[in-house]
C-alpha cells in the first residue's frame, strides 16, 4: 500500500470514529438551536440585516437580535440586542434601518430607527398597539405601517356597577360578531387594523384609513411617494364570506381610497415597480379546498396574469428593476425564481425555508436589492441560515452557519427521498426517510410515520428537529406528501376536496409499504403520529387498520359537525370544505369524521392537545379520548396548559411533545426514551 493510500485510509477511519463518538441530538438540544429569519438586503446589495433567533431556556420563548453580515460573508456582527428586535427594513439611502423593539416586560413592540454611521437609536413612535407592515417612502422621509385601532362596542345592557371598594365577579363577555376569537390571540376586541404614516424623524403618526375593515399585509408605495397600495376586504359581509379582498390606492395626503381590482377572489401582496407597474398575488374563488395563488401585473387600468401555465402557488413578489422575483413550492422544495420582462421563469435557487423548526414545513423569506437576493436557506441538516444569490443566478453563497457549533458535536440522521405508488389509483406519492444516526442497513429498525397538517400543506427535504429526535431515539422516520398536499399542482391538491379523509389514507399506507421494501424497517414495530390535519389522518388510520403498534393523535378534528360549530375558523370551513351546513346534510360531516370509526380502534392511542386550542378545539380531543376509554382501548390524554394550536410554539412545548410521543411508543415496544436524552 502506498503512503498516500495509507494516509487516505487513516483519515477515513478517523472520520468514522469521530462520527461514532458524537452523540445524537437530545431533548435539551432544542434550547441550543438558532435560526435566521427576515433577511433584508441593503439597497446596494452589499450588506444583509437579519433577525437571529434563539430558543431561550430561561424564558422558554423564541428571542431575537438583529445582526448584519456582508454579502461576501465578512463582518458578521450584532446590530441591535436585548430588545427582542424584529422586522428590520432598510431606508432607501442604506444609512438607516427601521425595526420593531420590545421594552422589558412589555408584550407590544415599538417602531425604532438605527443610524448606522453614528450607532444612534431613536424611537419613531410609541404606539398603543404593535405596528406591522413597515414600509419606507421612496425618498426616505416617511414610514408607512399598519396597527390595530381599538373600537367601541355598543353595550347590550346598561347595568349598575359595584360600589366603591366592592369585589364583584368579572362582568360577562358579550359577543355579537361572527369572528370573535382567534387561535393564539384570544378573544377579538372591537376595532380594526388601519393604515398610518409617520415622519422618519419621529412625531405623531397620521391615520389614513378608517371604518370597520382591516388593512392586510404590507403597504406598497408608489414611486412618486404620493400614494400607497394596500389589500383590504371592505365588504359588509366579509366575516361571513371570506376570501374576496381587493387592492386599493390610498392617497397619502387625503386618505382617499380608490379600488384597483374587482373580481371574485383574494388580491393581495402588492409590489410596485420603478415605472409604477403593480405586481400582486390573486386567486379566483371557486369554493375549492385548494385554489392556486397566481401572479398578476397591472399597468394602468389593465391587469394580466403572468405564467398562466405554471401549476404552482406563487409567493411574495418583489421587483428587481424590470423583473420580478418570486418564491414557490415545487414537490416539497421551495424555489426562488425570476419572472423576466419576457414573461419567462428563470430559476435562481432552491431550499428557501428553515424557519419552521419542529417539522419540515416550508416558510422563510427573501428580499431584493443591488442586483442580489438575500434569503433563508435550509437543508435536512440545518435550519434557516442567511444566503445570497445574484439576480443573474450566479454567486450563490451561504453566509452563516448558526448551528455549526452544536452540530459539530452531534450526529444527525441522514435523509433520503422515497416514492411510492398509491394502492388507490397508482398515483406517485412523494416522501422522505430519516435514518437513525449510526445507521446499519443490515439491522431492522422501528418506524414512525409522521403526517403533516393543513391538510393543504407540504413537507420536504428541510430541517426538522422533531424528526431528528425520533431518529436519535432509534427510529426510521417516514414523512410524505399524500394527495391534498400542495406543491404538486392544483388537481393533486383537490383530490381531497370534499373527500378528506379518504384516499390519502391509501397513499400513506402505500408509503409505509414502500418503506418496508427498503429492507431495514421492522414490520412489527410501526408507529404513527401527526398533528392537526395529520391528527385527523392518524385517528382515521387507527380506525381502519391495526398494523401500528401505537399512535399519537395530536390536536385533531374528530367530529366535523362539532368542529364547525366550535372552531375559530368555522366560516372558512363551512365555505371551502363542505357544500352544505351540518343540519342540512349531516351524513356529509359524519362519514368523514374519525369518530364514526372509533369502534374499530384497537391500537393504543395517546391524544395530545393544547388547552387553549380553538383551531381544533380541545373538545375534539376530549370526545376522542372519552370514546377510546368507552371502547376499552389503551389510551392516554396529554393536555398542554396555556398552549394554543401551536403546541410546539414555545421551546419546552416542542421538547415535551417529542418526549411524550417517544414515551408512549416506548411503552408499546419502541426504543427507550433514554436514547434521545
Describe every region a protein language model picked out.
Residues 235-236, 394, 402-524, 531, ...:
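Cap/lid segment of the alpha/beta-hydrolase catalytic domain
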Residues 52-65, 79-86, 98-112, 126-132, ...:
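A flexible loop/linker signature enriched in serine peptidases of the S9 family
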Residues 40, 144-147, 172-176, 181-194, ...:
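Non-catalytic accessory segments flanking enzyme active sites
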Residues 70-74, 115-119, 199-203, 251-255, ...:
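Short loop/turn segments that connect beta-strands within beta-propeller blades
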Residues 43-44, 92-93, 138-139, 223-224, ...:
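Residue-level detector of Asp-centered blade-edge/turn motifs that repeat once per structural unit
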Amino acid at each position: 500500500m502506498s503512503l498516500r493510500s495509507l494516509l487516505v485510509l487513516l483519515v477515513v477511519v478517523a472520520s468514522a470514529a469521530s462520527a461514532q463518538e458524537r452523540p445524537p441530538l437530545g431533548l435539551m438540544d432544542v434550547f441550543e438551536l438558532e435560526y435566521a429569519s427576515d433577511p433584508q438586503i441593503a439597497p446596494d446589495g452589499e450588506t444583509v440585516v437579519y433577525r437571529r433567533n434563539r430558543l431561550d431556556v430561561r424564558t422558554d420563548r423564541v428571542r431575537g437580535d438583529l445582526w448584519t453580515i456582508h454579502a461576501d460573508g465578512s463582518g458578521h456582527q450584532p446590530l441591535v440586542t436585548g430588545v427582542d428586535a424584529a422586522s428590520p427594513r432598510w431606508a432607501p439611502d442604506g444609512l438607516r434601518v427601521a425595526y420593531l423593539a420590545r421594552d422589558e416586560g412589555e408584550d407590544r413592540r415599538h417602531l425604532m430607527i438605527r443610524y448606522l454611521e453614528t450607532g444612534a437609536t431613536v424611537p419613531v413612535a410609541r404606539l398603543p398597539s404593535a405596528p406591522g407592515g413597515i414600509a419606507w417612502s421612496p425618498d426616505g422621509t416617511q414610514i408607512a405601517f399598519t396597527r390595530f385601532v381599538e373600537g367601541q362596542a355598543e353595550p347590550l345592557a346598561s347595568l349598575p356597577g359595584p360600589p366603591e371598594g366592592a369585589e364583584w365577579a368579572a362582568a360577562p363577555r358579550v359577543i355579537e360578531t361572527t369572528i370573535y376569537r382567534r387561535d393564539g390571540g384570544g378573544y377579538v376586541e372591537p376595532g380594526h387594523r388601519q393604515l398610518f404614516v409617520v415622519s422618519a424623524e419621529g412625531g405623531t403618526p397620521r391615520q389614513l384609513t378608517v371604518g370597520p375593515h382591516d388593512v392586510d399585509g404590507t403597504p406598497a408605495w408608489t414611486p412618486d411617494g404620493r400614494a400607497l397600495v394596500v389589500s383590504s376586504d371592505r365588504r359588509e359581509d366579509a366575516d361571513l364570506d371570506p376570501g374576496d379582498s381587493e387592492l386599493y390606492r390610498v392617497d397619502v395626503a387625503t386618505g382617499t381610497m380608490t379600488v384597483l381590482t374587482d373580481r371574485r377572489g383574494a388580491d393581495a401582496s402588492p409590489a410596485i415597480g420603478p415605472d409604477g407597474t403593480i405586481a400582486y398575488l390573486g386567486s379566483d374563488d371557486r369554493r375549492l379546498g385548494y385554489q392556486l395563488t397566481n401572479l398578476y401585473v397591472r399597468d394602468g387600468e389593465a391587469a394580466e396574469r403572468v405564467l398562466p401555465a405554471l401549476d404552482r402557488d406563487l409567493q411574495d413578489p418583489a421587483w428587481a428593476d424590470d423583473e420580478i422575483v418570486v418564491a414557490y413550492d415545487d414537490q416539497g422544495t421551495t424555489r426562488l425564481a425570476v419572472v423576466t420582462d419576457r414573461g419567462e421563469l428563470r430559476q435562481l435557487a432552491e431550499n428557501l425555508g428553515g424557519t419552521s423548526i419542529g417539522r419540515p414545513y416550508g416558510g422563510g423569506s427573501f428580499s431584493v436589492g443591488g442586483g442580489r437576493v438575500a434569503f433563508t436557506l435550509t437543508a435536512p441538516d440545518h435550519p434557516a441560515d442567511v444566503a445570497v444569490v445574484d439576480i443573474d443566478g450566479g454567486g450563490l453563497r451561504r453566509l452563516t452557519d448558526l448551528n455549526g457549533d452544536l452540530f459539530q458535536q452531534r450526529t444527525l440522521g441522514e435523509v433520503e427521498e422515497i416514492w411510492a405508488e398509491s394502492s388507490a389509483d397508482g398515483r406517485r406519492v412523494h416522501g422522505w426517510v430519516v435514518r437513525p444516526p449510526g445507521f446499519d442497513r443490515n439491522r431492522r429498525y422501528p418506524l414512525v410515520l409522521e403526517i403533516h397538517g393543513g391538510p393543504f400543506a407540504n413537507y420536504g427535504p428541510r430541517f426538522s428537529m422533531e424528526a431528528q429526535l425520533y431518529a436519535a431515539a432509534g427510529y426510521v422516520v417516514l414523512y410524505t406528501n399524500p394527495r391534498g398536499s400542495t406543491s404538486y399542482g392544483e388537481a393533486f391538491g383537490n383530490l381531497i376536496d370534499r373527500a378528506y379523509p379518504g384516499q390519502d389514507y391509501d397513499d400513506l399506507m402505500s408509503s409505509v409499504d414502500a418503506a418496508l421494501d427498503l429492507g431495514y424497517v421492522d414490520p412489527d414495530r410501526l408507529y404513527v403520529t401527526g398533528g392537526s390535519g395529520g391528527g385527523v389522518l392518524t385517528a382515521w388510520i387507527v380506525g381502519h387498520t391495526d398494523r401500528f403498534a401505537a399512535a399519537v393523535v395530536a390536536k385533531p378534528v374528530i367530529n366535523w359537525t362539532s368542529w364547525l360549530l366550535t372552531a375559530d375558523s368555522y366560516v372558512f370551513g363551512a365555505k371551502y370544505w363542505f357544500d352544505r351546513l351540518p343540519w342540512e346534510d349531516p351524513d356529509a360531516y359524519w362519514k368523514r369524521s374519525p369518530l364514526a370509526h372509533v369502534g374499530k380502534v384497537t391500537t393504543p392511542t395517546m391524544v395530545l392537545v393544547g388547552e387553549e386550542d380553538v383551531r381544533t378545539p380541545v373538545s375534539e380531543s376530549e370526545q376522542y379520548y372519552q370514546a377510546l376509554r368507552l371502547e376499552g382501548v389503551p389510551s392516554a390524554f396529554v393536555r398542554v396548559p396555556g398552549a394554543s394550536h401551536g403546541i410546539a410554539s414555545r421551546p419546552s412545548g416542542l421538547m415535551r411533545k417529542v418526549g411524550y410521543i417517544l414515551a408512549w411508543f416506548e411503552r408499546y415496544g419502541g426504543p427507550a426514551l433514554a436514547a434521545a436524552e
